[in-house]
């Protein structure tokens, strides 16, 4: 599970669409067939869909995409992409151009049962370097309307970045005692980051 279910809560409260066309912020893209299908997924991800056919000889698709201002990272490979630039790259069938901006905090569930909408006990937190950020993780049972009665969880995650030093603070889970997991395991993954000389937890 990616963070789509968790992101939806934030956008329901604010009224801002979870998926926004890229041309909302870059109007010139609307008239450019190469980039007009790009869109933002939540506040942290940019998706650049591949719509062209794959070259059957190379087993690759040549794809052109535009990265907006700032520093962005390929969500799959972690490769760094400076912004405000046009790019051309080959993609394999299993690849997909999704980019996370610097400072993104992406929560993922490690469970293999994708049909299970319950609150996970194991979470992987992927962090992309470069900018300090704060993310609030929202969770409910994913099935009932009990969240209206306050049966949901919130976890604040703070990422403080200062050159080669960075700190991550995962604050205590807020929520009614009946749904707070007895134990939660976090796996921290720092993308495009050199191996740390020292780690303190």
Descriptions of predicted regions:
Residues 4-197:
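Catalytic core of carbohydrate-active enzymes
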């Amino acid at each position: 599970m990616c963070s789509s279910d968790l992101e939806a809560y934030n956008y329901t409260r604010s009224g801002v669409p979870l998926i926004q066309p890229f041309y909302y912020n870059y109007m010139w893209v609307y008239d450019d067939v190469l980039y007009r299908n790009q869109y933002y997924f939540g506040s942290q991800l940019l998706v650049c869909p591949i719509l062209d056919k794959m070259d059957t000889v190379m087993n690759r698709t040549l794809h052109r995409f535009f990265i907006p201002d700032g520093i962005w990272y390929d969500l799959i490979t972690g490769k760094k992409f400076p912004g405000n630039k046009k790019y051309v790259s080959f993609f394999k069938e299993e690849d997909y151009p999704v980019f996370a901006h610097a400072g993104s905090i992406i929560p993922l569930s490690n469970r293999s049962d994708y049909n299970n909408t319950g609150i996970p006990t194991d979470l992987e937190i992927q962090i992309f370097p470069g900018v300090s950020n704060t993310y609030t993780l929202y969770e409910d049972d994913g099935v009932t309307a009990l969240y209206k009665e306050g049966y949901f969880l919130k976890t604040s995650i703070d990422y403080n970045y200062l050159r080669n030093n960075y700190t991550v603070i995962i604050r205590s889970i807020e929520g009614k005692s009946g749904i707070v997991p007895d134990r939660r395991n976090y796996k921290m993954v720092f993308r495009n980051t050199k191996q740390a000389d020292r780690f303190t937890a």
